[in-house]
Curated annotation (Swiss-Prot):
The chain crosses the membrane at residues 22-42, 43-63, 70-90, 122-142, 211-231, 247-267, 277-297, 298-318, 355-375. It comes from Borreliella burgdorferi (strain ATCC 35210 / DSM 4680 / CIP 102532 / B31). Keywords: Bacterial flagellum biogenesis, Bacterial flagellum protein export, Cell membrane, Membrane, Protein transport, Transmembrane, Transmembrane helix, Transport. The lineage of its organism: Bacteria, Pseudomonadati, Spirochaetota, Spirochaetia, Spirochaetales. It is a multi-pass membrane protein. Signal peptide: none annotated. GO terms for biological process: bacterial-type flagellum assembly; protein secretion. One of its GO terms (cellular component) is plasma membrane. InterPro entries: FHIPEP_1, FHIPEP_3, FHIPEP_4, FHIPEP_CS, FlhA, T3SS_FHIPEP. Required for formation of the rod structure of the flagellar apparatus. Together with FliI and FliH, may constitute the export apparatus of flagellin. NCBIfam families: FlhA. This is Flagellar biosynthesis protein FlhA.
Amino acid sequence: MLDARKNSILGYLGLNNKSDLIISVGLIFVVAGFILPLPAVILDVLITVNLVISLLIILIVLYSKRSLDFSVFPTLLLVMTIFGLVLNISSTRLILTKGINFDGQMIRTFGTFVVGSSGIQGLVIGFIIFIIIIAVQFIVITKGATRVAEVAARFALDALPGKQMAIDSAYSSGNLTEEEATRQKNDLQSEVNFYGAMDGASKFVSGNVKVGFLITLINILGGLLVGITLQGLNFNEALNNYVSLTVGDGLVSQLPSLLISTSTGLIVTRSISKNSFGGEIFDQFTNHLGIYWIVSGFLLFLAFLPGFPTLILMFLSLSIAFLAYSLSGIRQKEEIDKKMKLEEEQASIYSDKDVSPVVPLDPLALEIGYNLVPIVDDTKTSELLDRIVKIRREIAFEFGIVVPKIRIVDNMRLEPNAYSFKLRGVEVGRGEIKLGKFLVINVGIDSGIDGDLVKDPSFGLPSLWVNDDGRETAEKLGYTVVDPPSIIATHMTELIKRHSYEILTRQDVQNTLDVFKKDYGAIVEEVLKNFSVGEIQRVLQGLLKEQVSIRNLVTIFETIADFTSITKDIFFLIEKCRQSVGRQITSGYLDLNSELNVITLNPSFEQMIIDSRVESNHDLISSIDPNLKTKFIYELFKIVNEVQAEGFYPVVLSSESSRPIIKVITSREIPDLVVMSVLEVPQNIKVNVLKTVEVEE
């Protein structure tokens, strides 16, 4: 926005893309002023420019709502300091060389008219004014601004880690978008850099004040020396000419310096606000209108005391009373308008035109009871919020999907220690936490550890809630012990993995295609020629539903493209994509010897499963006899438990045709069962058959 405004102004002046050139040329001329003598007319112009720029600077500071709105200020301080020194050197050269014939109007005017008197009296008055300005600048404004800049720089740097963590927490909880978080971090870094620069730049201001005073003293002595010894003037003539011009030069150079010093003090003491400095003054001075009536009454009281200026005090008293009356009327009008607006808003709640059937739901949300609010408190370091950031990153790396923002809200309807994880407004998992305690996972009944017996919310394993003493005992016995944030984070991770296929939307697929197209345009073009985004989404969802990562999109899209001319059967394409990433799938279930231990099915029963396949456009079901299905589930469940008891991970290996039907049949009773087809196993992997499921017809 600022760049557009700058370009429009420069474009109007015919100086597009030449701002840097203009500043560079200006700085060269400034440096040249150290060497080249300037005519009095040019000196008057430059003195006026110095005064105008200083006035612009203080006005910009007053109208800025925050320090970063004028972030170039520290650099500008250095430039203006150099510019002022150049003017001092040039004016000194002209005064000493021209003497009586010096015709610089700005310096002569400040030496006579501004002082208000001429002769020796004017010199004394001018020098006193000069000393007062120097004292105010150095002792009051500059010293205070320097100290404030030092403290602000230190505090800004100390607060940086905490503010960055607060931004990360707000982003991970869904209160900030990625763009907003990035912008706030950039603003935070800019703020630290600004106050760090101001800490050093404030030294320019104090140094400039000291140098200004020193230059004036040197000019007075030098002027008297040149006038008396070189030009033959007596002391009074030299005093009237050289000292008068030197005082005028000192005043005309210290006025811009005073404005810049004041600007420095203002900008380092400003806090972030919605209004400018003037707006803040007005708002805060009108918060308490009763004080104006008190001041008015006090002035009226003073007006009747002997010796006080009665008319002036009465005029001021009436003016302040009128101001208080006017502000009261404005305040009453604002309150009436505010009340009417509130009534309109309340009425609009019941208005049909504001009722919309489309209410956006959070893709993912974690709702917590009020006792769990401290573990997500972003005013201090929150382990859970940090974990959420890591969860999103890890799942993106493991499964190849972008997990949307997880919004964290407190829900008074939940039990105080409960939490609920929701997917688009529907609960997919919940648990209960005991703050101050730890959960010992997978303990036996006779473990010898005292605690409350519960089930682990993530995997359903028998667990115990224990205190610190029980934690130490459990760790010595070799049990896994986790704290409350870890419990919630682990549960959320498993729920997101389990429902990753539901999280993936068409828009996510389209965004992936847009990014993927930049490097693999040929594949994307070939796939989109025959498949819609929705069909591609269904293939990817079919893979995610069985915990198959879709990070290897190149292989997956190439597989889809290979079969575009053969079929558009989604279930067939899912199987072919599984086979194309078979090495990836198999690697997750190999034992320490890189061998695959599996459970197989009786061939005749497997054929029955294949024959029971019923396929529609959007679903795949089995028409197998319910009694046979029950027997099969029973036998399979028994074998799975036996295999697990022997220390193996249960994996069912079947043919390509039966694999998806077996998964459909077992998805409700054994949802986490891994079912692979023979074609998914690489040829160099040794397969060991542990058990075979036999089902009697």
